[in-house]
């Protein structure tokens, strides 16, 4: 995600990137006479995850007799996003590229439709996550293939010892490492969450929930809003602010929660919550297993006390923050047939499981049929800690992305501008009344719609 940048900004910056960017050394599989193919993938933060794609690439290249090159580009300084912008502007570069959640919309007219490939994948693996579909389709056509590598959920990673000691909640009993709900799971809602947040705050181990303008903050607040049925617009983009009791209730709950968080959460970035958990100062964060994975290395005494559970439910159900990657094929690419073949290969169950294993369970396949990989049962310590990380039927939950059901073009602006956390901050930090904050929100949305 390009924080605070619109497409014009990205294109301008991207033009400069082609001359000055430094990429990791590419992996080249020179196999034969099937032509050349070059892909740019997100440079995975988990050690070994890139190697999983390299192994898969070698297997496919040998079978297909294609000269395949894989580049891995990180998102530090938005390098990957700017690379995509530069290539779209120049109409040359890789044949395919990893695209963040909202990037498909920026380049839809320059991406090859992949409806034929998606139909084959669905016929084999079943339905694709609806959020991935919402983001990857434009004007009824699939413009990218939902990816496994890098795709993440953001459920609750809980210090089960601290939660039980200070809030009286046994999260391992509530959500065991089995496909079943335990005692207390049915009452794991935002009211229970608020009470636990207050108790852990009083004990000096507050929940580590960012409230600023980075993705971790926008994502968890987005899931909270959806669980209250609190939409800022309808599916056509018309504001639904006035007389919206559900939106008021959701904002009120978020304001109440914020009172029991660290004072500086309004300035936290996406690493701050990780650091809070790893340091032992926090009893709960909403995150993929990234913080836990680092704790296994740097603070094993913390990692051994962590347990992943679904997000709390609200009056309209339980929603899990979900952030998918998509792989697009440029329409100006020279080997689009081979590109589709390669993406079909790495979308198989066997390939998805290989990348998920190498990521320590971090990666989430886009197909619900793949939520049963053994890696989530066996990763530890403690063994079973991430069993409930992927969405499972007994969670009775829905994957979500903030600001749906707004049209993707508008939702992406609302997301990048973090309008959900900003409106909360105006009440919780700015001293505004609910009516004042909602009036500001409606004006901002109307300005975005006018362009």
Can you say where each PLM-predicted feature lies in the sequence?
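Short helix-initiation/N-cap motifs at beta->coil->alpha
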Residues: 73-83, 187-192, 265-278
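C-terminal lobe and pocket-closing loops
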Residues: 290-303, 315-419, 450
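Glycine-centered hinge/linker elements that transmit conformational signals in sensory
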Residues: 191-200, 236-267, 311
């Amino acid at each position: 995600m390009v924080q605070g940048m619109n497409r014009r900004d990205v294109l301008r910056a991207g033009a400069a990137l082609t001359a000055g960017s430094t990429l990791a050394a590419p992996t080249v599989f020179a196999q034969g006479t099937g032509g050349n193919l070059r892909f740019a993938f997100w440079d995975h933060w988990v050690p070994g995850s890139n190697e999983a794609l390299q192994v898969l690439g070698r297997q496919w290249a040998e079978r297909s007799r294609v000269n395949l090159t894989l580049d891995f580009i990180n998102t530090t300084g938005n390098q990957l996003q700017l690379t995509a912008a530069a290539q779209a502007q120049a109409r040359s570069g890789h044949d395919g590229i990893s695209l963040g959640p909202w990037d498909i919309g920026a380049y839809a007219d320059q991406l090859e439709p992949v409806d034929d490939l998606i139909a084959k994948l669905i016929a084999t693996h079943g339905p694709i996550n609806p959020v991935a579909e919402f983001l990857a389709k434009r004007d009824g056509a699939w413009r990218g293939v939902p990816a496994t590598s890098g795709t993440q959920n953001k459920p609750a990673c809980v210090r089960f010892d601290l939660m039980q000691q200070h809030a009286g909640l046994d999260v391992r009993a509530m959500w065991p490492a089995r496909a079943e709900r335990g005692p207390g799971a049915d009452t794991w809602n935002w009211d229970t969450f608020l009470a636990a947040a207050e108790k852990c705050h009083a004990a000096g181990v507050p929940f580590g929930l960012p409230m600023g303008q980075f993705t971790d903050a926008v994502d968890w607040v987005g899931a909270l809003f959806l669980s209250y049925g609190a939409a800022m617009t309808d599916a056509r983009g018309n504001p639904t602010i006035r007389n919206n009791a559900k939106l008021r209730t959701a904002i009120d709950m978020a304001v109440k929660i914020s009172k029991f968080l660290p004072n500086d959460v309004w300035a936290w970035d996406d690493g701050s919550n990780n650091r809070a958990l790893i340091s032992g100062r926090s009893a709960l964060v909403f995150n993929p297993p990234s913080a836990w994975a680092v704790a296994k290395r740097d603070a094993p005494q913390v990692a051994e006390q962590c347990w992943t559970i679904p997000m709390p439910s609200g009056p309209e159900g339980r929603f899990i923050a979900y952030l998918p990657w998509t792989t697009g094929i440029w329409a100006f690419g020279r080997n689009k047939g081979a590109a589709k073949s390669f993406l079909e290969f790495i979308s198989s169950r066997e390939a998805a499981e290989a990348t998920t294993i190498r990521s320590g369970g971090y990666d989430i396949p886009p197909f619900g049929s793949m939520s049963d990989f053994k890696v989530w049962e066996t990763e530890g310590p403690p063994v079973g800690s991430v069993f409930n990380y992927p969405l499972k039927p007994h969670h009775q939950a829905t994957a979500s992305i903030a600001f749906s059901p707004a049209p993707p073009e508008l939702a992406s602006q609302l997301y990048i501008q973090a309008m959900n956390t900003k409106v909360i901050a105006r009440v919780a930090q700015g001293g505004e009344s609910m009516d004042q904050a909602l009036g500001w929100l409606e004006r901002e949305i109307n300005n975005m719609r006018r362009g």
